[in-house]
Amino acid sequence: MGIGSKILENNIQKSISLGFYHSHSELRKSFYEFFKSKNHEILRSSSVIPDENDGTLLFTNAGMNQFKPLILSSTESRRVANIQKCIRAGGKHNDLDDVGKDLHHQTFFEMMGNWSFNDAFSKEEACRYAWEYLVEILGINADRLYVSYFGGIEKLGLPEDRECREIWKRIGVSSNRILPFVAENFWEMGAAGPCGPCTEIHYDRIGGRDASRLVNIDDSVVEIWNIVFMSSVRDSCGQIRHLGKNHIDTGMGFERLLSVVQNKTSNFDTDVFTPILEKTSELAKKQYTGSLDSRQDATFRLVADHIRAATVAISDGAVPDGTGCGFIVRKMMRRAFLQGISKLGIERYAMSELVPVVASTMKEVYPEIHDTSTHIRKIFNDEEAQFWKTVDKAKKMFDSVAAESKSPIISGRKAFNLFETHGLPLAVTVELARNIGREVDETEFERCRLEAQKVSQKASQFKLPISADDFPSHSDKEKYSYVFRNGKYEFPQVKTRILQVYKDQQKAESLEANDRGFLVLEECQFYGEQGGQTSDTGHLLIDGREVFEVENAKKIAGGAVTVLFGRALLPIRRDLRVEQKLDETRREGVMRAHSATHLLNWALQKLGVGSGQKGSSVDCDRFRFDYSTGDEDLSKEQRTELLIKCEMKMREFIQNGGFTEIIETSLEEAKKIENLQSDVKEDRIGGASVRVVALGSGADVPVECCSGTHIHDVRVIDDVAIMSDKSMGQRLRRIIVLTGKEAAACRNYTKSIYEDLRSTDPKERSKTGKNIDWKRVPIADQARISILLKQKK
């Protein structure tokens, strides 16, 4: 332990007033029991992997994430408390690069919190609950506590929160401990969205002094409880107005509070970390001392944190791979592997021994981690084997690059070439450079990456200053307005009003002919890209004339607003009434493919293939389906045979027919459906309805929660053809499937190959392995055709 830390620890031991010790299990229990006594509903933590429809988050990073629907739309009054698993390792809240350097930053942490939705309890009750729990239940000395409140921002018309100040006085906090702050005590969800003043409780780790001047300045005085009064909303123009309802959102970092009640200056000295650090010390044959001045101790903290975070993420379904949250999990694992071996001397393939320790530490509160620890450990070993294979091969190339120049800076372009050509991740290159006293030009690396990356135009088009509250009359329910009559679909041409026009990413009054821009309609019939389903396309009409070509549509502002992108064919302006005309052929093809996606998921589960869907992308009469293979160890032949059976099962289901049933119900009712394929996400709690889609009739049919558009009769899918199944990395595979007209086209092509190969007239036989387009041949026919080709020879 460093000199500064020793002094702080000694002072704490001299002046600490806590009368008893709390293990992490005891602290959790006391929190739940206290808020249960205050008539709160106790909820389990939701997954650290957010709902797939929430494209704004890589991981659940705050206790309030799961309550977004309740905050934005529900009128239900509720008192709720929980301890939420969180990971901050990407995006706005990113602690990844700070871990190890101090005694408190973590990527995985738990957030204690209680909430009042729609005035379930008052501002004063929230403050009293917090004070009572800290002082009377945990026994924290009130003389160590300071409170801060919002001091007001005059130019924004936000007054000082004097009500809050008076509440703390009534509770018994002396005036010199009630401190006004501005930015520190105004909470915002983002640039636009819910916001409001907050009050915070701060704890002086040393005590026996006036530490009021150190609040929000010195690390010896730490914030332990934040109470947010969510009463306002900031629109896309920066204007703040009343939300129309009052919510209270409170949060306490679990590990930080644990360090307080266990008399520790460091989160890493609490009993959620000490077993992991002790095992790491055993593997490294080195002692962890808790010093801030030791690079070795910083590595201990990094390894303990990253292994813990990756273990939790994998237990919740994350798969280390090259995209999204899987990329961050892989990055954490590989950083722990590299630093654990290179700096602590841990042997290769020993890091997975930390997984059972993490699982055992958290067994009581998160049994799912313990139950899947064997599977998690296998993933660790597989990932480490793949990592060292890459590093050993690419390290020689790095050594060559490093030897080319004596400069202390390694070119970012050369680092990018190592990544692009040899698969050496930037993080590994940076660590290798540090080991020889060099740095990598990461700015140049990023520039090279952006140059090489073909950024999808669609992905970047929809960055508009739009908030969910900007268009209260907007709705996209008309996307479900279609009927199946006399063997075909009918889509009404819905008339509506243009609410807003955007040009060059900014609000505009109008678009001239040939201008490209964005539109928000009042009652939008176009399906906005969401949940893997591609968007509708089509036209807007006035008096029968096409005035705007819709090229794309996407849901933004947290999925609350559907925005159309396209080209004006004639001048149009805001407030015009227009008629919507979908590309019906495209919509029908997408509906067939989306329903077939559910059918494939069902068939795979029935045959025991894989361990669950990881993602999908649905287009017109074709889709891709990503699934986890879990611990499967199948040969190519075995997997192909299973997929052939899967296709047969799907085709049989389609031939038998049956109508689609779609209902909207509450979360609680949806969770009671026994054969529901998709998990009902805990972050969509009661108050928000879910849409349940059942294909066909009977007990054994595909049933999923889904917001997509679907066919009304299973027979309309016509046919399905599984075209390919390939590996996308460790334990992840991708299936490509065609439906409807696309499936029929590949069947006709395959039929022509069979006719050619079976012809008795040599002049009519023209097919060889080289001139067959195998991408147009279903997987079920590829092996048979290969046999016929061999017989032909």
Swiss-Prot record:
The record's free-text note on cofactor binding: Binds 1 zinc ion per subunit.
Any single biological process term in GO: alanyl-tRNA aminoacylation
Record's keyword terms, sorted: Aminoacyl-tRNA synthetase, ATP-binding, Ligase, Metal-binding, Mitochondrion, Nucleotide-binding, Protein biosynthesis, RNA-binding, Transit peptide, tRNA-binding, Zinc
Residues reported to bind L-alanine: N226, D249
Molecular function GO terms recorded: alanine-tRNA ligase activity; aminoacyl-tRNA deacylase activity; ATP binding; tRNA binding; zinc ion binding
Catalytic activity: tRNA(Ala) + L-alanine + ATP = L-alanyl-tRNA(Ala) + AMP + diphosphate
Residues given in the record as ATP binding sites: R88, W187, I224, W225, N226, G253
A GO cellular component annotation in the UniProt record: mitochondrion
Enzyme Commission code: 6.1.1.7
A Pfam match: tRNA-synt_2c
Subcellular location field: Mitochondrion
Keyword Nucleotide-binding in annotation: yes
Alphabetical list of InterPro entries matching this protein: aa-tRNA-synth_II/BPL/LPL (IPR045864), Ala-tRNA-lgiase_IIc (IPR002318), Ala-tRNA-ligase_IIc_anticod-bd (IPR018162), Ala-tRNA-synth_IIc_core (IPR018165), Ala-tRNA-synth_IIc_N (IPR018164), Ala-tRNA_ligase (IPR050058), Ala_tRNA_ligase_euk/bac (IPR023033), Thr/Ala-tRNA-synth_IIc_edit (IPR018163)
Cited Gene3D superfamilies: 2.40.30.130, Bira Bifunctional Protein, Domain 2, Threonyl-trna Synthetase, Chain A, domain 2
Domain notes: Consists of three domains; the N-terminal catalytic domain, the editing domain and the C-terminal C-Ala domain. The editing domain removes incorrectly charged amino acids, while the C-Ala domain, along with tRNA(Ala), serves as a bridge to cooperatively bring together the editing and aminoacylation centers thus stimulating deacylation of misacylated tRNAs.
Subunit structure: Monomer.
Protein name per the record: Alanine--tRNA ligase, mitochondrial
Species assigned in the record: Caenorhabditis elegans
Lineage start: Eukaryota, Metazoa, Ecdysozoa, Nematoda, Chromadorea
